[in-house]
Each structure stands twice: as C-alpha cells, then as structure tokens.
Amino acid sequence: MHNMSGNHVIGNRNSTPEANNTSTLRPPSSRAIGSGHSLRASADMASLTGPSPSNRIRPSSDFYGQAQQNLGPNNAESDSQDKIAQQWIADIDQYETTLEEMAAATLDQDFKDELSAIEQWFRVLSEAERTAALYALLQQTTQVQIRFFIQVLQQMGKNHPLSGVLSPASFDKDPMSNRLSDAMNKLNVDSARNSMARSSVIAPSTKRHSGLDPTTISAMFPDAAAAIATEKAKFTQQTGNPPSSNRNSIALDHRSSMAAPSISAPQDGRDAGPAGSSPWNSGGNGDTSAKPSSSQTPMGQFVQPTPSGGLRSPRPQLSSNNTIQQTTLNAPDKTPADLPLLSPYNAGSGNWASMVNTPMTSTFNAAATGGNQADMVANATAMKLAALSTVNNRFALDDVRKYRRARSNDGTPGQNPVPTGPQPGINMPNANVVMINEHGQVLSREQIMALQAQQSLGMGGQRSRPSSPGLAMQPGLAHMAPFTSPQNNGFLSAYDVSSPLLSAGMQSVNMGSLGMGGHEGYLSDHSDMVRGRSPRGRRGSSKPPEDPTDPTLLQDIPSWLRSLRLHKYTDNLKDMKWTDLIELDDKALEERGVNALGARRKMLKVFEQVKEAKADGKLG
C-alpha cells in the first residue's frame, strides 16, 4: 500500500493537488478551474507571471530545478566540459589577436627596416650561433607567447621535414626565414612601444581593428594561420559546433558583421567617402578591400623599403574608434645620387656585415648579390644596431666559419716568407678594404699611405733609443715596417715590437750582436727585450744612467741597487755597507740570495769599477 501511495504521488506531480491526503487509486479530480486561477495547471508557465505569488502552493524552484535534478551526477562533468570549451575558445581568440597585432606591427616601415637588418645579421651566423640567439630571445617570452609558439612550432613540424629546418640550403629562399622573423616580431608585443597594441591589454573591450584582409595575414604568417585553423578544426570536431567568438576582429574569419567600423570602408557605403582616403586602398575600385593583397610578402622576404632617411616619425595618439594611419615620413622621390650617404660603404657591394677591415681575405663577391639586399636604409639601421657591439669602432660581425680567415701564425714553412728587401706595402688587388679611424671617419687612400709612411719611418718611434744598434744589425727586420697583422687594426696601429711575428724574430737575435758593453749585458728578465724596453731605463725616459761609483749613491745601498736595476735583491744586501759589499765574491753573493748568474756577474763587474774608483782616489 505504501508503494501504491508513492506511485500516486509521483504520478500526481504535474496535476492539481488533492484536497485530502488519503491514499486512493482513483484518478485525480477533474474540477473545472478558471483560466485565470493560479492553480489552473502546474505545467502552464504562464501562471508564474501572476501578481500574487503568495497564492502558489508549489514553489517556483519546483519548475526551475527539474532540469538540474534530472541530470544527476553528470552536472559536474558538464560544467567542466563547458569550462574547457570556453578556455579553448579564449585561446583561439588570443591566437587570432596575437596574429593580427603581429601583422599590424609588421606593416610599420620603420620596424620592417629594423627587422630586415636583424635578419641580415642572423644570416651570417652559424647553426650553433643561430640556435643560441633564438634560445636567448625565447627567454623573454610571456606565457601567452609560449602557448602561441607551441602551436606554430607544431604546425611547422608537420609542414617541413626535419632536415630542411635544421640546415636550410639557402636562407633567403627557405621558409625558415619566415618563422625566425615571426619569433623576432613576436618578442616586441609586450615592449614599451607607443602603439595601439597596448590598447588590447589596457581595455579588453576595445579591441583593435587592423582592417587587414585575412588572406593578407595568412600570406604573411602562413604557419601561424594554419595553426589557428587547425585549432578551430579540432574544436569543431570535438564539440560539433564551430568556435564562437566575441572578438571585434576580422582576422582569419568573416565574423565582422557586428564589428566596429574598420579602416576599409563598407561595401555598401564605398561611394560616400572620397576615393583613396584610406591608406590601405590604392584607388576607388570597388574590389580593392576584398581582394587579397598580393604585394604583401611573407616575413623574412621584404622588398626594398622606401628611402625614408632612416628616421622614426612620432606616432599619433589614437583612440579606440579612430583609424590607424601609416605614420612613416617618406622623403620626396629623388634619384639615388641626391640621397644623403647614410653608410660609408658602397650600396652595391653586397652584405653590410661583410664590409669589415679584413686585409687577409677579400670580402664577399659583389656580383653574387643583388643591389636590393643592400639598400641605404637597411645599412643605416644595421650600423646603428651593430654599434652596440663594436670594438674600437670597427665592425667585426662577419666571422662565418666558411669565411673565417687563417691565423697569421699558422703558415707552413715555405709559405709567406719574411721579405728581405724594401717593399712599398702588401699588394691586395682583390681586397675591398675600408679604413676607419678611431673617430669613425673613413680614410682615403692618401691618408692610408701617409700613415704607412709614418710607420715605416718611425719603426722605433716608441723606443727610447730609436738608433739602437740591435735593429741596425738585422737588415731583414727594417723592411717589415709596411707589414702589420690584422690584429694591429689593419695598418692603423702604431708600430709595436710586441707583434707576434716580430717578437719571434727579436728572440732569435744574438745578444752579443747588439753591441752592448759593460753592465748593459744583463737584463733583469727576458720580458724587457720582448717588450722593446731599453736596458738603461724605462721606455721614453730621457734620464741618463747614474754613475755606480757616485759616493753619495754608495751611501744609500737601496738607491744604488735601484740604479743598477737590481732592486729585487735590496732585502738581501741592504744591511751591508758599500765597503763590505764590494768585497763579496760570486759564492758570497749566492749565499746572500743572489741566485741569478747574470745578476751576480753584473754585481761583480760593478764591484770592480768601484774598487778601481776607490784606488784612484775618487771615493776618498
């Protein structure tokens, strides 16, 4: 009976309530109830709008809660799936926003010039250097950028074989340059550039409207566009519905019916405004905005930019509803001869990074590269970027392995013999050398020859005794003045005997041929000759050597030893008087700590001079 009563209650949920509570099997009462009565029918939702909710016997939650009660334990799972779907849609929106911002930033001519200069620098790196550079740049990415790159890299892995990505045959033609420039461009999203890209971070509700055609963006970033399309396809396959979006954007889709006005005029109101008012429309043709722009080349394959003097123009302060104008101040159309020389290098001589001071090897073949790759603006921008990493104002960026020059001391015994006769200079007919002094000024041929002549005449100019007999005894060394190694800044460094090639020759000179007599036969250490230091004193010193038999000097043993350049033995001999010191012999000096044989011989010679002076009565 209890079960029957329960069934009766369940079956009576959608009927009018019974007046009595006794359990019975008879059907529910079919009393006539007016249409305006609140108890007309429980399933009639019109009764919920009645003005007197206090007359209701069943609460409103009995109606609203039935769908949730019927789901049971599947409710939590459905909520989690909804959250995952919403997050997926948000990620796709973020990818599209990122791609649109990248495309808008790439259209900036100044940024394109800077990126082209970076690509030229990147082209001369080895594989290991490219990997290290990309790894260092990826350390600056945000979490949004990391997720974006993961999708793009996965798409790149599907489209390109591994061998083609790791070792491209030609950097200019390989699609890898597009992907690398994408990475370079994406790192500037969170920078402090004063552009409209900051509006998407500050106010998410005011999305930017680039007005770019989706096919244009796809052509500029093919892998990124393909990755986003793949994500959309996955979402549609999983959920059965295409991803909906509330983005006010027209990138990669045509959901722009409710979007705010973009840069391109609408189709129906095209004739309302003046023709050509938009920077993206080249004329009044009705198909210009809808037609894909074929002039937009992919990233990494930029055409020659307009000569704009290499200067950035101030960016306008734009509100969320204003159109984005191109703000590059282009110079008037002039011939190349009228343009200012922004670079000291010839514009048709090839890669800017190769025009370094390398007398040992010639630079890149100028005929192999086109003039479009070395335009004036790219050279100027590249020089500004490279100025941060120069040494002595010399550009030393081109050090690729296949162009790396041999070291000056790696020559085999039959190659590059030392010249033994007068030579005016090193003849390099194929070398394209540009000399730059420490002030960054380009030197002419006459100035370079004058510097070489000065170096030839002043071979011993840094020595205290230019007429030292040691150099005159070696006629072969006197003709090496015009030759300087690349390590000496290419004919611009003052002559120094510390050059590796000359130091080897100086070490082989017999000291007896120097014509040194008396106490000058001893040098306190070997580095004095290697450094080109005169035995009588420091370089550049005009003070004559002091007389070791000076009575005043003999009273001060430390000063006397210093005049003989034997001050390292002051602690061993300072407690003795000069009269006792000159009586020491070789064995006694060795016992005193004078271990060097040359020092002992020099002391004994000076002792003999002092004894002779004492015998002559000079010392009293």
Curated annotation (Swiss-Prot):
It is found in: Cytoplasm, Cytosol; Cytoplasm, P-body. SUPFAM superfamilies: SAM/Pointed domain. Transmembrane segments: none annotated. Keywords: Cytoplasm, Nucleotide-binding, Protein transport, RNA-binding, Transport. GO terms for biological process: nuclear-transcribed mRNA poly(A) tail shortening; protein transport. Monomer. Binds to RNA. This is RNA-binding protein VTS1. The lineage of its organism: Eukaryota, Fungi, Dikarya, Ascomycota, Pezizomycotina.
